[in-house]
Amino acid sequence: MSVKPAGRAIPQKVENAVGAEIEWLVDRHDGAPNFEMRKFTIKSGGSIPKHYHPDIEHEQFVLKGRYKVGIGQKVYEVREGDSIYIPAGAPHWYENSNNEDAEFLCIVPKKEKYDSVYTEAESGLASS
C-alpha cells in the first residue's frame, strides 16, 4: 500500500513533445503489481507527436481542460470528465490549441520497458 502526498511526483518532460510533462503517480516503486498511473500535462500550445506502443494499451481520464487526441484515423475533441481507451499498437497523438493547460490520467500495464515508436520521420524511436 502506498499514499503519495500531492506534489511528490516530479514532473518530467515528455520525450519528443512540446510543452508536455509526465508525472509517475503510482508505479513499480510503490509496489503496484499490474498497472502504473501517470498524470500528463499539456500546456496551452503543446503537443505530443504521433506514436504507438506495440504492446501497451492506455486507459485515460481527462482531469482538466480541452484538447484534441488522434487515435488511428479519427480525431476527438476531449474535455474534463471524458474517458479514453487506446488499444495497444494504435497510433495516437495529442494537441492542445486552447488557452488553458490540459491534464489527464493515464493508466498502463506495468512493463519493464515502455517502447514508444514515433511515426513522424524526425522523431525516430524512443522509450518512455
Where would I find each of the regions flagged by the language model?
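Short histidine-centered beta-strand/loop micro-motifs
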Residues: 26, 49-54, 95-97, 117
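Conserved short histidine dyad/triad with adjacent acidic residue
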Residues: 23, 38-53, 88
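A short, N-terminal "cap"/entry segment at the start of jelly-roll beta-barrel domains
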Residues: 1-34, 117-128
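Short acidic-glycine-tyrosine-enriched beta hairpin
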Residues: 73-88
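Glycine- and acidic-residue-biased ligand/ion/polar-headgroup-sensing regions
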Residues: 55-67, 72
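Short beta-strand His + acidic residue motifs that chelate non-heme Fe in jelly-roll/DSBH
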Residues: 50-51, 69-70, 86, 92-99
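A short hydrophobic beta-strand segment most commonly corresponding to one strand
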Residues: 39, 85, 100-116
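Anionic, Ser/Thr-rich low-complexity intrinsically disordered regions
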Residues: 17-20, 26, 37, 49, ...
